[in-house]
């Protein structure tokens, strides 16, 4: 059996560009793509923390080191500059890989979309 699992996440990145008339996609700083293990043309889901919008598109390379998160085409209507978004990619993982210790790549960024940390799991949520 295979399970649809979180593979990659860029957490709380700020939208830097909204390009309505650019061919659809999301341009992401190449440093962030590599850190999160997202490849060009891979399907991504984007969740807007500010307004609750959730949508899918595909990733393209943004200028390395720029902090770019550019929503292009119709995706540009789903956010405003400065909105915080979570960018996620999923993969089908078989039971053997899961039992062998497969883990996702989670990337956390600062207010300039520079990497401030990473980890391979989502912590257990507690009632506090």
Swiss-Prot record:
Binds 1 pyruvoyl group covalently per subunit. The keyword DNA-binding does not apply. One of its GO terms (molecular function) is aspartate 1-decarboxylase activity. It is found in: Cytoplasm. CDD domains: Asp_decarbox (cd06919). Substrate binds at residues 57, 73-75. It holds the Pfam family Asp_decarbox. It catalyses: L-aspartate + H(+) = beta-alanine + CO2. Its cofactor is pyruvate. The modification Pyruvic acid (Ser) is found at residue 25. Its EC number is 4.1.1.11. Belongs to the PanD family. This is Aspartate 1-decarboxylase. It comes from Burkholderia mallei (strain ATCC 23344).
């Amino acid at each position: 059996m295979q399970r649809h699992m979180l593979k990659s996440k860029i957490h709380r990145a700020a939208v830097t560009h909204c390009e309505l008339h650019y061919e659809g996609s999301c341009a992401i700083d190449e440093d962030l793509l590599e850190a999160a293990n997202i490849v060009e043309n891979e399907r991504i889901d984007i969740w807007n923390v500010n307004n609750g919008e959730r949508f899918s598109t595909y990733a393209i390379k943004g200028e390395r080191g720029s902090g770019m998160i550019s929503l292009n085409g119709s995706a540009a209507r789903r956010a405003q500059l400065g909105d915080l978004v979570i960018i996620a990619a999923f993969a089908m993982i078989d039971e053997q890989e899961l039992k062998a210790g497969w883990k996702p790549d989670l990337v956390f960024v600062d207010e300039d979309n520079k990497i401030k940390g990473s980890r391979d799991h989502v912590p257990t949520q507690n009632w506090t």
